A protein has these predicted regions:
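Acyl-donor-binding surface of acyltransferase catalytic domains
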Residues: 2-148
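Conserved GNAT acetyl-CoA-binding A-motif
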Residues: 61, 186, 215-233
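Conserved catalytic-core motifs of GNAT/GCN5-like acyltransferases
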Residues: 115-124, 247-263
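Short, basic/aromatic recognition patches
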Residues: 144-161
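A conserved beta-strand-loop-helix scaffold within acyl/acetyltransferase catalytic domains
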Residues: 156-162, 167-187, 191-195
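Conserved G/P- and acidic residue-centered "switch" motifs that form tight phosphate/ATP-binding loops
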Residues: 170, 202, 236
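Conserved acetyl-CoA-binding loop-helix of GNAT-fold acetyltransferases
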Residues: 190, 194, 200-217, 241-245
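Conserved active-site alpha-helix within GNAT-family acetyltransferase domains
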Residues: 205, 233-252
Length: 263
């Protein structure tokens, strides 16, 4: 199940490293990073290892520097059923901290402020029958141009090539969007944003359901689309509730760990 999503996320992961021919495990696909050429952000941090696991078959994508492959495989074996809990992630940080320093790097371990690692949850569906159609509201509208309605309060990143938004007095107050052309893609990643004064009113759920229903409808514009995914942070409980209320299923989780150079 979700084979197209697995290909989509693996392809995205390959943009951050070099696919390896090494067979770690029949269920683990490896992407290697070069520790001397990590991409550091403006704060001086870079992702040193990340892993993603699909729930239907337990398969994983791992991208890391070669020096960490064996320790991470041992970790996967030890915590196979609990890879995403605070307990297991803290254990991993503590046990790899010294190894990281040998390579001129230091792990970001600010656990008190929850900045030591970043979690992501992927929801999705392949079938429009999974969707809670009863959650749709009459004020959800489909539109393409962000200039068609008043979108005051939304950053440009929340204006997609295709949008389903809640329209109140000619103003969009909640918007579900995708930024990839549905004419050319089998997997569409959608997002949702709602203005603060309009949250907890069911608008987000209505827009997500309407967007996913259309993308999976088989209409000419979206006839290539096979799967819809919805990505959110592991700490964003309200966003996860929106996904579940829409009828989307939790299909995968990812966790990313950061490092910086020792100066």
């Amino acid at each position: 199940m979700f084979e197209e999503t697995k290909k989509f996320l693996y392809k995205s992961a390959c943009e951050q490293g070099k696919p390896s021919n090494r067979l770690l495990d029949k269920n683990i696909r490896l992407i290697e990073r070069d520790k001397d050429n990590l991409e550091y952000n403006s704060d001086g941090y870079a992702y040193i290892f990340e892993y993603l696991q699909f729930f239907d078959d337990g398969s994983m994508i791992l991208w890391t520097i070669p020096e960490f492959i064996e320790p991470l495989l041992n970790y996967f074996e030890l915590f196979r059923k609990d890879l995403f809990s605070d307990k297991s992630c803290k254990w991993l940080l503590e046990n790899l901290k010294n190894d990281t320093e040998k390579y001129g790097l230091t792990l970001h371990t600010d656990h008190e402020n929850r900045k030591d690692y970043q979690g992501t949850v992927f929801f999705g569906t392949e079938n429009e029958n999974d969707l809670n159609i009863s959650k749709k509201q009459n004020n959800t509208v489909k539109f393409y141009s962000a200039d068609k309605f008043d979108m005051t309060g939304f950053d440009n990143i929340w204006r997609g090539v295709l949008n389903f938004g809640t329209l109140i007095d000619n103003q969009i107050v909640s918007n579900c969007l995708n930024t990839t052309n549905p004419l050319d893609n089998k997997v569409i990643d959608i997002g949702i944003c709602t203005l603060d004064d309009y949250k907890q009113k069911g608008y987000a759920v209505s827009n997500v359901v309407s967007m996913a229903e259309y993308l999976l409808s088989g209409a000419e514009e979206v006839k290539k689309v096979k799967e819809v995914i919805y990505t959110t942070g592991s700490g964003n409980i309200n966003s996860q509730k929106t996904a579940k209320s829409s009828g989307l299923r939790e299909i995968a989780k990812e966790v990313d760990f950061c490092c910086r150079r020792i100066l």
